[in-house]
């Protein structure tokens, strides 16, 4: 499960390392029997699909480039993901693990006991047929039994034990998970903060931050940690994913880039962006930001 290296039969496959999709599977009922479908036999849940306007790196109004090196790519439908996990104390069965073209992680389809269907990000170790559950802040505070600490279960940070690996963490209570959603990412609950109502969490970057105890988080690490090993092998595969060529500034004219112009290949200029900003180590974060008060330790280990 994870990735496979292709045989070097062509230039495009010589260095390619791609997904093997072994984790993709779905449990469906055919007649009186349950059948497990694999790989390309698995189709998404139609009720959770929607068309998504793809800006392709351009503005809606005038079509100006707002994000360079984006555009084209294969057509795709957006899968509606439940990042809030706000369905409290209703058990759900994992029916499928599926591919999602909009993210590096896999997603899994849940069938709740009341008949509702939802997608969530697939955590490592969760299998088809397993049961997951979440609990809201109100139910937890009322003393109702907490779900087990196992991959896929979600609860407020206040009730997650110290040292637990989590993902899909909220920054603002009720807004939905924003942190640790990509393939293989995780964060760690470090314990209670000295500031009342907050919990210390180590971010994927290594930064230690205070997050409100009411924020939801899902237990476990995001699956498909092998994503970092993938090598596309050829430019065409990047185009299928919506990436366009990246032109060097030194290959441009002076009117197009600060590095442009000169007779032949020239060097000696300070690295700059196309808009004249200093790059390669230049700090772009605001010096005084509201959220600075929640950062306990920076990602390089130094206190803020």
Curated annotation (Swiss-Prot):
Classification via PROSITE patterns: RIBOSOMAL_L2
Gene Ontology molecular function, alphabetical: RNA binding; rRNA binding; structural constituent of ribosome; transferase activity
Residues in coiled coil: none
Gene Ontology BP terms: cytoplasmic translation
Renumbered residue ranges of the record's region Disordered: 246-282
Any Pfam family hit: Ribosomal_L2
Basic and acidic residues bias (residue ranges): 256-272
Gene Ontology annotations for the cellular component aspect, listed alphabetically: large ribosomal subunit
The keyword RNA-binding is annotated on this UniProt entry: yes
Function: One of the primary rRNA binding proteins. Required for association of the 30S and 50S subunits to form the 70S ribosome, for tRNA binding and peptide bond formation. It has been suggested to have peptidyltransferase activity; this is somewhat controversial. Makes several contacts with the 16S rRNA in the 70S ribosome.
Description of how the protein assembles with itself and partners: Part of the 50S ribosomal subunit. Forms a bridge to the 30S subunit in the 70S ribosome.
Entry's family note: Belongs to the universal ribosomal protein uL2 family.
Identification of the protein by name: Large ribosomal subunit protein uL2
Species of the source: Aquifex aeolicus (strain VF5)
